[in-house]
Amino acid sequence: MSLLLAPPSYFPFRGLRRSTAAKQPPCLRLVKCTADRQSPEAARRSAHYQPNMWSDDYIQSLTVESPLKVEEKEQTKKLMLLKERIAEVICEGKEVEEQLRLIDHLQQLGVAYHFKDDIKASLRNIHSSLEEISSTIIFKDGLHASALLFRLLRENGFSISEDIFEEFRDEKGQYFRSDGLKNQTDQAMLSLYEASYYEKDGEMVLQEAMECTTKHLENLLEEEGSDLKLKEQAAHALELPLNWRMERLHARWFIEACQREVMVIDNPLLLEFAKLDFNAVQSIYKKELSALSRWWTKLGVVEKLPFARDRLTENYLWTVGWAFEPEHWSFRDAQTKGNCFVTMIDDVYDVYGTLDELELFTHVVDRWDINAIDQLPDYMKILFLALFNTVNDDGYKVMKEKGLDVIPYLKRSWADLCKAYLVEAKWYHRGYKPTINEYLDNTWISISGPAIFTNAYCMANNLTKQDLERFSEYPAIAKHSSMLGRLYNDLATSTAEIERGDVPKSIQCCMHERGVSEGVAREQVKELIRGNWRCMNGDRAAASSFEEMLKTVAVDIARASQFFYHNGDKYGKADGETMTQVMSLLINPII
């Protein structure tokens, strides 16, 4: 398969609302899972993963019929009325900066998806008058307004040059250095900081802006007497910039920050609407998760592969990170199922299977032939049959609804994934240490990004025959997104995986190939991360709503990876923060 590669510079090494009370997480007894051996000769490893934290009984309890049906109907009616009023507000004639603030608030509150066409039309009008707008006093002399304009246009796929910041050179002719910005407000520096994370390859102005604003905000946190609300905003931004954040998690934070008046929005209707919408969408998530839990329990694969991670709820949380809007329910359904199989198959290749078994399994998946399973050991027969039936069922639904045969594309992505897993298994069993380039060329596929992207492509609501015929290779943005998932994963999991016995990760490849310390290797991996983000930022423009959806999913794959692997492995060890965020996004409504 031919692939569109990144520029060489970035591979330098060559439910129902029943109560306003917060739902409590389930308390389950921790059990160490051990696996039955397939044969006395086979040496089986075990990672001793944490067991599932979310029982099916608990998940089903989230959607028990509620006595508050009348109240829910009233809330739905109120939601629709507020939506109509906000649509009118968007269409009102406003000054450009006021329009930008409104769009920014809608996006950060997580409700912009209701007004996509209106927002796109507003930004298109602004973009068509960009030269005139940027010369006005408020943008010429206002760093905050200019940074907001820049970020929103880039974020929504419009072209805008970093030259918009030319007016903000300091007296020495440098950008954002010396004392040139000491009179700019802290809020403006925060806006510029967020804008700088939309930089493309070679944009030195934005790189300097990132350095300067990061230092400024760090100093702000240390200053006594500074505005506490602004300090909280700065701390949130320094932890992760907006462009790197999982959208739904940020939306909840932003709504609650507005409730605490840490953030100020111009129109109180927006906050009221956002709270109602968040809770309404959360009810949808509960119902989707409940149906998926019934499917997973009935499938019974967990009992047959007790050595593997059982992570249905966390797998669903991934999909909310990738496509949170209610309209993408079919993608969330198919991809949650896919995530469960990715996890199980990954553990077979990484931990449990012998090399001979793995070669057989890869061959059977590549053939996609149910008649070939007789050559597999029993545990693999169950796994392949479950995968085969589930993927074919997803393909059948698309065929029934759209008359399109997506099964060849789905099975190709699973074959690619298993082949990449097999390469890593051979490296491990043969004690081979790959170069960093060899490693990255294989593992951007083994992180499962292409399989996720393929599911998004095939489950898209507006998929056409022509779109399907064009899907002959993975686009560049899918590669960059997958690479980010791989690198984030490596930073979080490599130490534990090497200790239990696994192939060298990107960090160890750098250390071995270049003779550097682990600390230096980690910094080199972080630079790869920044480089791939720059590439993705340069590929956000879309020619159609279909392409726009796919590129958004690609970006959100990276954002969700950042969440799950930021400051540790929150997927393998699914208690702690992961449990907190499951409760926040999927279970507890906003009060």
Swiss-Prot record:
Pathway recorded for this protein: Secondary metabolite biosynthesis; terpenoid biosynthesis
Binding site for Mg(2+) 1: D346, D350
Biological process per Gene Ontology, one example term: diterpenoid biosynthetic process
Catalytic activity as recorded in UniProt: (2E)-geranyl diphosphate + H2O = (R)-linalool + diphosphate; (2E)-geranyl diphosphate + H2O = (S)-linalool + diphosphate; (2E,6E)-farnesyl diphosphate = (S)-beta-bisabolene + diphosphate; (2E,6E)-farnesyl diphosphate = (E,R)-alpha-bisabolene + diphosphate
Comment on pH dependence: Optimum pH is 7.5. Active at pH between 6.0 and 9.0.
A GO cellular component annotation in the UniProt record: chloroplast
Tissues expressing the protein: Highly expressed in flowers, petals and sepals, but almost undetectable in vegetative organs.
Range of the transit peptide: 1-46
Comment on bound cofactor: Binds 3 Mg(2+) or Mn(2+) ions per subunit.
Residues given in the record as Mg(2+) 2 binding sites: D346, D350
UniProt temperature dependence: Optimum temperature is 30 degrees Celsius.
GO molecular function term, any single one: R-linalool synthase activity
Gene3D superfamilies: Farnesyl Diphosphate Synthase (1.10.600.10), Terpene synthase, N-terminal domain (1.50.10.130)
Short motif DDXXD motif, span: 346-350
EC number from the UniProt entry: 4.2.3.81, 4.2.3.-, 4.2.3.55, 4.2.3.47
InterPro entries linked to this entry: Isoprenoid_synthase_dom_sf (IPR008949), Terpene_cyclase-like_1_C (IPR034741), Terpene_cyclase_plant_C1 (IPR044814), Terpene_synth_N (IPR001906), Terpene_synth_N_sf (IPR036965), Terpene_synthase-like (IPR050148), Terpene_synthase_metal-bd (IPR005630), Terpenoid_cyclase/PrenylTrfase (IPR008930)
Entry's localization field: Plastid, Chloroplast
Family, as annotated: Belongs to the terpene synthase family. Tpsa subfamily.
Domain notes: The Asp-Asp-Xaa-Xaa-Asp/Glu (DDXXD/E) motif is important for the catalytic activity, presumably through binding to Mg(2+).
Known role: Sesquiterpene and monoterpene synthase involved in the biosynthesis of volatile compounds present in floral scent. Mediates the conversion of (2E)-geranyl diphosphate (GPP) into linalool, with trace levels of myrcene, limonene and (Z)-beta-ocimene. Also acts as a sesquiterpene synthase by catalyzing the conversion of farnesyl diphosphate (FPP) to alpha-bergamotene and beta-bisabolene and to minor products including alpha-curcumene, cis-alpha-bisabolene, beta-farnesene and beta-sesquiphellandrene, as well as seven other unidentified sesquiterpenes.
Name the record gives this protein: Monoterpene synthase 8, chloroplastic
Source organism of the structure: Hedychium coronarium
